């Protein structure tokens, strides 16, 4: 089920919310779990068995881990941990990477391996990382293993976060798995955040996506320098509003049910360094890699050479997590190298650069970094980057670039304003306390919702970009 289908915000979510608070407390988690499994199975019911088996495997493995650790059998516990992690990773590796790997082996070794093109289960990358988080937190004593199977299954499959995160850590959500009471202010706050996220996705990302895909269809060879930069800028803003919009919808929906999730974005395009950008962008994924990969490898505590290796490995894995294509590998290594340069080579020089210039430089580096991310092949990425820095047949600026600049500048201005914290501050001042302000705020959110409905009915938006990961 897609979160931008009319069925989700106007039927599925309201019915689930109503049932959750109408049912007795002892039935609420079971009802929410049933709704989450239905959400997962919608459209691809054949994959439900994979999720159920993963939940059962990790539930019993977690109980066994805790029991072995209490008995002091650390070696046996480590064996259970490793075997369960391998079992968790198998579906992810098969559905996301087998096709690319088989095709590569066929090319290199002239083999005839079958290249399957099976669609991946909904949110397989996200719920796999959720399961690994639970195992690690139990093994390292960060949280006790949840003894109630329904509550544990709900942690894994809770539908607001299932499709594209945020990746909620087990230690953060486990204390919240008790049924929640209805709190009007909390539900209202969640609804407002949900509408804001829906508007980001349907309105802003949709309006930015139309010219971007038009420029991408033209191809880098047909673009001018201005057109290539405009396309990269449109994608940078579109991806931000697409993914942060989904995150707001997920966090808002979870809040309606009483769950408090941490923010997943913190105005990343205001960052004054690449490291700061990644502390603000997809924060739940960054926290996951830092907590479960980077720090266990030694982090930055083991000398310069080891730290460089750790950074490169983590960013290689981050790229591969997004996909097996070479473009994602290059994208991950690009950020690994930038972070190494910032940390070990350019730190003192950058400290002397004014903050505003550091922000501009960081933003330009990030925009450049999105080119391999949205490109279908390395050749396309290289051609697009070449066009950004050297004029081809279309020159510095051409009719296509001027047309899309002329038709998109209003939405670009709105998008830039909304991507900066000033937009939030303006909203907070505008909707300050008071009856009149409350009425204006209500009308504002109703208007946003109506615009979203219009966009959803007309289909003037693209599917969630991060749903493919």
Please state what every model-predicted region is.
Residues 1-468:
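Membrane-embedded transmembrane alpha-helical bundles that form the catalytic cores
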